[in-house]
A protein has these predicted regions:
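A broadly conserved detector of short glycine/acidic/proline-rich loop/turn motifs that flank catalytic sites
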Residues: 20, 51, 309-311
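Outer-membrane beta-barrel pore proteins
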Residues: 20-25, 30-43, 78-84
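Surface-exposed strand-loop-strand hairpins of Gram-negative outer-membrane beta-barrel proteins
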Residues: 18-25, 53-70
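Outer-membrane beta-barrel porins/channels
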Residues: 2-14, 60-61, 70-344
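Transmembrane beta-strand segments of Gram-negative outer membrane beta-barrel proteins
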Residues: 5-18, 38-55
């Protein structure tokens, strides 16, 4: 697994591989670099709905099992200038999520298990602009509904036990943006680690540092790039009643992410595309690749609609003894997102 980081924070951000933190187009810039909201001169509201699905194919000791999970994920953002120097933003989105099913493994994992820690962040930010540089402070409340489903079967009789609950915690971030020239800008954000939980679950989220750059090649074409470092070693989610034998919920190493994207405007249309590479945090490692396409259409000078497609190609996980493959796991994901933003 790449980890619990979820980078598909809005339709616009997904289509640009979340590499666009140095260049603000709408309020969803709050999910990347809140300091960049100083580039938005008017009050701005943005909303998206992503339909996200992952298929997982297991081959364990020659026994094949396939799983398919699908989840709708809503997000919303609001930004408003307070005066010429101060700006306020409010974000509601998910930057940390998982929905994983692990099949029965003889002698090792007798119960088929599904774990779904889905975390929703509510994050207000205040930004201050001084000439071409801006700074922002963000507070993050993380609401975490979770579930643990375990199924035990004997012959053709199966029994499923489900444990559900909610927990929450706090985190924060500092960010800065610099408009170097009219065509070049950069941004930097550091998200602090967080730790919280209850008697059933312990959540330890990593600190994340991200650097963004944007370069306007022409007045209508912009290139975006980003690098992120997540300190995932030893961080993740632990269930009191689940041992995680494959190691999908806890990081064994830190993770680096690189992404780049491009946006070109033609009349009322915006054409977007991007690619991102993430280091997997599990024991076997590998690179998870994601490819994106997106389009935007300016319906009026105030209202724009966006659409995005994401295709995920995860690194194959294999445990081999001699010439025999003991365990093989292959994940593939697809997402479709539709959203819009309105400038007041």
């Amino acid at each position: 697994a790449t980890g619990l980081n979820f980078w598909e924070t809005s339709t616009l951000n997904s289509s640009l591989a979340s590499a666009n933190g140095a260049s603000a187009t709408d309020a969803s810039i709050l999910a990347l670099a809140p300091s960049s909201i100083s580039q938005l001169d008017e009050s701005n509201i943005s909303a998206s709905l992503m339909y996200y699905g992952v298929t997982t194919d297991y081959n364990i000791f020659g026994s094949e099992t396939d799983y398919n999970t699908k989840n709708p994920i809503p997000m919303g953002f609001f930004v408003t200038p307070i005066d010429e120097s101060y700006f306020f933003g409010l974000a509601i989105y998910s930057r940390t999520a998982a929905d994983i099913t692990v099949p029965t493994i003889p002698l090792v994992h007798p119960k088929e298990t599904r774990v779904t820690p889905i975390m929703v962040s509510v994050s207000p930010s205040v930004a201050y602009k001084l000439n071409n540089v801006s700074f922002a402070v963000s507070l993050e409340y993380i609401h975490t509904p979770y579930a643990l489903e375990q199924t035990t079967c004997f012959i053709n009789l199966c029994n499923t036990l489900k444990q559900e609950g909610k927990t929450s915690g706090w985190a924060g971030a500092l960010s800065t943006s610099w408009q170097i020239t009219s065509s070049v800008s950069t941004a930097l954000i550091h998200r602090f680690s967080a730790s919280f939980g209850d008697e059933n679950i312990t959540v330890k989220l990593p600190s994340i540092t991200s650097l963004y750059g944007a370069f306007a090649i022409t007045p209508k074409t912009t290139l975006h790039a980003t690098y992120s470092y997540s300190k995932f070693d030893g961080k993740g989610v632990t269930y009191a009643n689940y041992q995680d034998p494959i190691g999908l919920l806890i990081g064994y190493q830190d993770s680096q992410r690189v992404a780049t994207s491009i946006e070109h405007k033609i009349g009322r249309w915006s054409l977007r595309g991007g690619v991102s590479l993430d280091e997997a945090i599990d024991q076997l490692g590998g690179i998870d690749k994601r490819f994106r396409l997106g389009v935007g259409y300016m319906v009026t000078k105030h209202f724009t609609v966006n659409a995005a497609l994401v295709n995920e190609d995860y690194a194959i996980k294999e445990a081999i003894a001699g010439e025999a493959t003991l365990v093989k796991v292959q994940n593939n994901g697809k997402a479709f997102s539709l959203g819009g933003h309105y400038k007041f």
